Amino acid sequence: MAVWHSANGKVYLPPSTPVARVQSTDEYIQRTNIYYHAFSDRLLTVGHPYFNVYNINGDKLEVPKVSGNQHRVFRLKLPDPNRFALPDMSVYNPDKERLVWACRGLEIGRGQPLGVRSTGHPYFNKVKDTENSNAYITFSKDDRQDTSFDPKQIQMFIVGCTPCIGEHWDKAVPCAENDQQTGLCPPIELKNTYIQDGDMADIGFGNMNFKALQDSRSDVSLDIVNETCKYPDFLKMQNDIYGDACFFYARREQCYARHFFVRGGKTGDDIPRAQIDNGTYKNQFYIPGADGQAQKTIGNSMYFPTVSGSLVSSDAQLFNRPFWLQRAQGHNNGILWANQMFITVVDNTRNTNFSISVYNQAGALKDVADYNADQFREYQRHVEEYEISLILQLCKVPLKAQVLAQINAMNSSLLEDWQLGFVPTPDNPIQDTYRYIDSLATRCPDKNPPKEKEDPYKGLHFWDVDLTERLSLDLDQYSLGRKFLFQAGLQQTTVNGTKAVSYKGSNRGTKRKRKN
């Protein structure tokens, strides 16, 4: 039976002003058949696995912190293709086009053997085991113990042309009407920051600012107790309208709870008891113990596990293998704006810490009669080894109004680098130039000298890798280049005895129809 109802729903109208549509780079970028191979040197770093080591006065850093649980953020600087002396200058028209790089493949090489490290704290806040306790746990004034464990296992890398965006939880500013009393838990908020080289990754205790939110300095291991652990904000980067921060990523994490402990100290949030809501919660969560029993004083409910990364195997490695970029997750399909590339890496499967012992007494080691631990100093060092290889494709950007409008809205400095602005003719072609401009005999120099281009990531710490002179057209001379030629079905051609800059696919003969 059909019954008529009056319109009781809302009417949604389109916006009064049109919303600008962001085009994918595939819609206006013209790709050429010119490919380059780029590779870095062997990148090595050595340091202490837990903290920075300073001199006796504390004013000079002697050994930096190098941990397998840190992020490594490589900032690869590429040459400007518009200033290349190309073998074939007819590839593009500089009056109507500009050249950019596109990433087609990469391989992150890692040296050193697989290994598991142990991290911990000499004053770790844990009170016995809560999984298999045979007696009721009692607390004292200081129950901290010297405890160590292995971290969560993580392999991950993120590739983009801007730094990777990370997220972590930090202390928030309380509202003005809420008087923050001493000893109360502060409000927390989620913050987004760039992941820099050396930032700690999550090792099983969460992505949090431990320096600001753990005053006891004993709830986590030494390598993160004074740090902020960050985790990539994949949700934010996946919804980026331009897709520059993350073209694609690979991730593998695993852990399991190995030990179960309880924290020492006074519980901040009490379990609801009879005094709540006029006795409504009486005996709702627990029944008190009898007098004379150890259970009379209820224990602490701050339970936590120590995780373990479990087995480290070469069967599940993300590194030392090629990755090919056919389609990125965002609108930027691998175009390296500003001729730079950011690779954020975390890998703690090669997490061995070297133990180095040094005899600290005068005389030869062979003269030692018996072992004395006080005569030896123990040191720890961690080493890392990287090598990065890229396959770059030369692409053309047409200088059309619609394309330039989107690029200007995305990053106006790109147009300045391309020198597209109108340069007026100087009023006077002859300018005055003083030789001794800083002497007392000449006038004062200009107080407002022309400013150099400011780095948009000034103040951020990255591992800079200069690849401006590390490009080659001879792809078949390199391991990653040969893999790319094979998987893409390309073969290198020769013109006039020199290597050509183009590749063509293999031609197959047409099959003849069989006569019946």
From Swiss-Prot:
Record's keyword terms, sorted: Capsid protein, Disulfide bond, Host nucleus, Host-virus interaction, Late protein, T=7 icosahedral capsid protein, Viral attachment to host cell, Viral penetration into host cytoplasm, Virion, Virus endocytosis by host, Virus entry into host cell
InterPro entries from the UniProt entry: Capsid_L1_Papillomavir (IPR002210), Capsid_L1_sf_Papillomavir (IPR036973), dsDNA_vir_gr_I_capsid (IPR011222)
Signal peptide: none
Keyword Isomerase in record: no
Keyword Disulfide bond appears in the UniProt entry: yes
One Pfam entry name: Late_protein_L1
Subcellular location field: Virion; Host nucleus
Gene Ontology CC: one annotated term: T=7 icosahedral viral capsid
An MF annotation (GO) of this entry: structural molecule activity
GO terms of biological process kind: endocytosis involved in viral entry into host cell; virion attachment to host cell
Broad class of where this protein is predominantly found: virion
Stated family: Belongs to the papillomaviridae L1 protein family.
Function: Forms an icosahedral capsid with a T=7 symmetry and a 50 nm diameter. The capsid is composed of 72 pentamers linked to each other by disulfide bonds and associated with L2 proteins. Binds to heparan sulfate proteoglycans on cell surface of basal layer keratinocytes to provide initial virion attachment. This binding mediates a conformational change in the virus capsid that facilitates efficient infection. The virion enters the host cell via endocytosis. During virus trafficking, L1 protein dissociates from the viral DNA and the genomic DNA is released to the host nucleus.
Subunit structure: Self-assembles into homopentamers. The capsid has an icosahedral symmetry and consists of 72 capsomers, with each capsomer being a pentamer of L1. Interacts with the minor capsid protein L2; this interaction is necessary for viral genome encapsidation. Interacts with protein E2; this interaction enhances E2-dependent replication and transcription activation.
Protein name (database record): Major capsid protein L1
Native organism: Human papillomavirus 5
